[in-house]
Amino acid sequence: MKSFTKPALGAAVVLALAPLAAAAGDALTIYSSAQPGAIRPEQYRNGVSGPAVPGYAVVRHLRMLELKPGRNTVRFTDVAALIDPTTVSFESLTDPKGTSVVEQNFQFDLVSAQKLLEKYVDREIEVDQVRGSGVETFRGTLLSTSGGLVLRRADGGVQLLPHNAGVRLPELPGGLITRPTLVWDVAAARGGRHEARVSYQTGGITWWADYNLAYAEGTNANACKLDVGAWVSILNQSGAGYTDAKLKLVAGDVQRARPPGYAAGGLPAARMALEEKVAGFEQKAFFEYHLYTLGRPTTLPDRSTKQIELFPVARGVPCEKKLVYYGLAPGWRNVQPNPITDRNYGVQTNKKVDVYLSFQNAQANRLGMPLPAGRVRVSKRDDADGTLEFIGEDTIDHTPKDEKVLIKLGSAFDVVGERRQLAFSVDTSRRTMSEEIEVRLRNHKDEPVTVEVKENLYRWVNWKIVEQTHDYRKEDARTVVFPLRVPAGGEQVLRYTVRYTW
């Protein structure tokens, strides 16, 4: 039998077998996935395996059990299959000082057809094999189960049989269990009824936030409003279900040690009125993270996904729509350790103009609460029939209150860009180079648009724009942004010259 064992404190005789009684209460603290939106719907719908789920939880069980004075064996089968046995804790709340764990085992040698056969290697079995319209029975000693059944008959001959043959075993061998089981050797100073708490970490369970945004046009082409709703999505593939459990969620990047090579404030009055009817999540700061506690018990069946409302819909949140043109093709945006003097480096163009939405996570905007990392889906109402149509999605990281949320929706259909190099020169003796860039934006809409042209000055860290046709602002050490107004059905042209020195 496979087991995880803590060293015993001394030899003793087991006096009693004390199975744990029915649950008095379960509690889970689930830690947010480091990869919001990393699990696609088709993955968990088709049964993504528990070890592939990028999250974990701390599970706590309260159980009532009968102990005798002295040594007791306690078995606990209501345990997650993906438990980390090194994190298991057993504690008697009735007599914590007089009750101690001498030895702890995690048994996971689960019964299966293959395991049963392996237990009968070098033992005699009977195998029924269909032969035409009849059945032939073979008796012999099982030598191997690899690639089929290998039997040594009484006459010394060897019989090879397929795995799907009908095997008859005289009895169920010992040492096999139907569910993962924790077994404790408990020393109790006091006998009688004890309330015990069992806790452990398990994989195969995670949570993330799903935000549903309804977009509406504002007073101009860039202004807009959003209705922001948020739900918590919980995926449980841990190998255990949790009934009427107390639920807490932790948002934040909590550090965990991994083996090498491992892959894996107050509420507005309108909201309070709703929460009096159905208890929702209460949020508070917790260490350097945020803790969300559900005000009611909930049930999380194994191999299931559950959604719970994180907060009621915040309506009419002011937002801004931006068109951003990043003309440098994606493959050429990396920073290099030396000046890039190759004139053909980065001249490839990207024609797509990206569409972004941004809003401030502020109380004045009917938000102002920590937003956990998750997926953001945006829809817009079709005035013809009143239905909401999907217009894009993105993921966001953990976002504190009063910070800006930026969402990329996709690329504009009617606005295109083109970037090209007009001139380039290098003077290696003076350690200088000069490059002239032209950006053309074409607007096929019936209304003017504003496009932010983002230019990455990627050739070297020391740069100066010596000529330009439009004003710009510096976004960071190597990026500038030119806001351009493009007329309806027209074109706007930007030219600038940058000089690098090293």
Q: Where are the model-predicted features located?
A:
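Long, intrinsically disordered, low-complexity accessory segments associated with secretion
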Residues: 2-5, 15, 20-502
